[in-house]
Design a protein with these regions (language model features):
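Beta-rich carbohydrate-recognition modules and glycan-binding surfaces
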Residues: 2-243
Length: 243
């Protein structure tokens, strides 16, 4: 019996060594500059009676966005910049299950905070005719004037309470659906002063992560070892009982 466990221990050590040596599969994807089929655009509140003013220009290597929120405090105001992977509604979503970091390389003026958002397709909630029904994941990001190179841990993007309330969705249904990312968005921070211009110039947005395939192989081997260990222990017990 001791010999069996010694052999299993040796095998386990070998498995761990193999796992350490397995090459980690890096996942990387660029949001901007734009990939095939993607589109960048700006939005404001004018269609809903707001007075926010937006200036927007897009080139291959730089997106320039400027906004001043409407000064009427009695009205809600909003503006932002959207990078859309599926502008034609063909469900060409991006699988970011292996993403662990979202990178921003941006120039900032006129604000000390931006909201960074991803919108994901949720088959139980999303109506393709209504973009706001995609699942929202949000991160408030502090910024400074000038160039900002920011790495955001992807797990820090959260589903805000107002999304659940607006959509009438139970909070227990909190799966982020990272496997179907439809859009990335940058918008004004919550405390942006009304009427004050703020500028976001986007040099690059990208994501990266490590595939967990090697970890899955490792667990599968460990499971196999456990089965072998259990199988080898049973004949010994039966032999002891017969004696």
């Amino acid at each position: 019996m001791k010999k069996s466990y010694t052999i299993l221990a040796i095998i386990a050590i070998i498995v761990v060594a193999i796992y350490v040596m397995l090459p980690k599969e890096r996942f990387a994807e660029t949001v901007f500059p734009l990939g095939d089929g993607a589109k960048v655009s700006a939005y404001d509140d004018n269609a809903d009676g707001g007075k926010s003013a937006v200036q927007f220009k897009s080139a291959d290597s730089l997106v320039s966005f400027q906004c001043a929120l409407g000064v009427d405090e009695k009205k809600s105001a909003w503006c932002g910049l959207v990078f859309n992977f599926d502008p034609n509604g063909e469900k060409k979503y991006h699988n970011w299950k292996n993403v662990d970091t979202l990178y921003l390389d941006i120039d900032i003026a006129g604000t000390n905070e931006i909201n960074v958002k991803t919108w994901t397709f949720d088959p139980d909630v999303t109506d393709l005719k209504h973009p706001e029904t995609f699942r929202l994941l949000l991160k408030e990001v502090p910024v400074k004037p000038g160039r900002n190179q920011i790495a955001i841990p992807f797990e820090q993007l959260y589903i805000p309470d107002f999304w659940y309330n607006d959509r009438g969705v139970k909070r227990s249904r909190n799966r982020p659906h990272h496997e179907s990312v439809a859009r990335v968005e940058i918008s004004a921070g919550w405390n942006q002063p009304r009427g004050k211009n703020f500028t976001v110039n986007v040099r690059e947005i990208s994501v990266s992560g490590t595939s967990n395939r090697a970890y899955g192989i490792f667990l599968f081997i460990i499971l196999g070892l456990m089965i072998v260990a259990i199988g080898r222990s049973h004949p010994v017990k039966e032999y002891d009982e017969k004696k």
